[in-house]
Design a protein with these regions (language model features):
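Short, surface-exposed beta-strand/loop "edge" segments at domain boundaries and coil↔beta transitions
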Residues: 26-27, 44-50, 125-128, 167-168, ...
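A broad structural signal for short, well-ordered beta-strand segments within beta-sheet-rich domains
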Residues: 90, 124-133, 242
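Short amphipathic beta-strand and strand-loop transition segments with alternating hydrophobic
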Residues: 94-98, 148-149, 241-248
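Generic structural hydrophobic/aromatic packing signal, biased to beta-strands
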Residues: 38, 118, 159, 171, ...
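Short, compositionally biased
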Residues: 174, 188, 194-196, 200-255
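Contiguous ligand/interfacial binding patches
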Residues: 79, 129-193
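Short, surface-exposed loop and linker segments with low hydrophobicity and enrichment for Pro/Ser/Thr
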Residues: 26-33, 109-111, 153-154, 159-165, ...
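Short, low-hydrophobicity acidic/polar segments
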Residues: 1-116, 121-123, 185, 190-201
Length: 255
């Protein structure tokens, strides 16, 4: 594609990619020898100066070689948008096809960095009422220092690093109210791959629990029975109390 077209927008929420050229730019499609290259996340034009090898179009790896070699993931990746996805450099080369006057572009993105996945110990509540599914809590960690990973919805922490050896970044974390510490220096992870680091072996702790109205839910996700005596720390951490809505076995009302 024209080297002057340096901005694209794509939406991966539904697995598709949509090319939106700059205003006034028309993609003709069907020209002999044309190639399309894509990178993410978008960088301002000034930051892309000298990052594209426009004469080397063998592959997107060659085309974006300078960008890839110079790329440095953010130190603080705790924010999903500003840190985590902003560190996830991806590139692609695409082919265009024209039908009914419309140009369609197909891309397959390649991750150019490596990913460290930090797995924490888990607590699994198994309720005496077997109709209630198990309740799983991944331990929350606190990270000090500049390197901070992003917490994923599955409870793991994820952090992008440059692939291979030579990383000096260390994830310094703690859990159990700071009583337990851990240190992880992600290294020897191949490009476009991930490596899992299990903190203290990431054990799973099973807890049998009889869930009752009046039980307490704490901010860290743990449950304290209604008949247990709460510590001052637990009292300050209560965010919800279990209750019952609607009829129950001892409710004879007709509302």
């Amino acid at each position: 594609a024209d080297a002057g077209v340096d901005a694209v927008f794509f939406d991966c929420t539904n697995g598709s990619l949509t090319w939106q050229p700059e205003a006034g730019v028309t993609l003709a499609g069907g020209m002999a020898g044309e190639k399309y290259f894509l990178y993410y996340p978008y960088q301002e034009t000034a930051k892309m100066a000298g990052k594209v090898n426009a004469t080397d179009t063998t592959s997107d790896g060659d085309f974006f070689a300078t960008l890839i070699n110079d790329w440095q993931p953010e130190a603080d990746q705790s924010d999903y948008t500003q840190g985590y996805t902003a560190s996830d450099l991806m590139t692609a080369t695409g082919s265009g096809s024209k039908a009914d006057g419309k140009l369609s572009l197909s891309f397959s993105m390649t991750h150019r960095m490596a990913l460290a996945v930090v797995e924490m110990p888990k607590t699994v509540y198994k309720f005496t009422d077997t109709s209630i599914p198990d309740y799983v809590i991944a331990t929350t960690a606190d990270f000090s220092g500049e390197a901070k990973p992003c917490r994923n919805t599955d409870g793991t922490y994820r952090y992008f690093v440059r692939p291979g050896q030579g990383n000096t970044v260390t994830l310094t974390g703690s859990y159990a109210d700071g009583k337990k510490e851990f240190f992880i220096t992600p290294n020897n992870i191949s490009v476009s791959s991930y490596k899992t680091y299990k903190v203290d072996g990431a054990p799973t702790i099973d807890k049998d629990h009889n869930l009752q109205v009046g039980d307490y839910l704490l901010a860290d996700g743990n449950i304290v029975g209604k008949d247990e005596t709460l510590t001052e720390e637990q009292k300050a951490s209560v965010i919800a109390i279990v209750f019952h809505a609607g009829h129950h076995e001892n409710d004879a009302s007709d509302y």
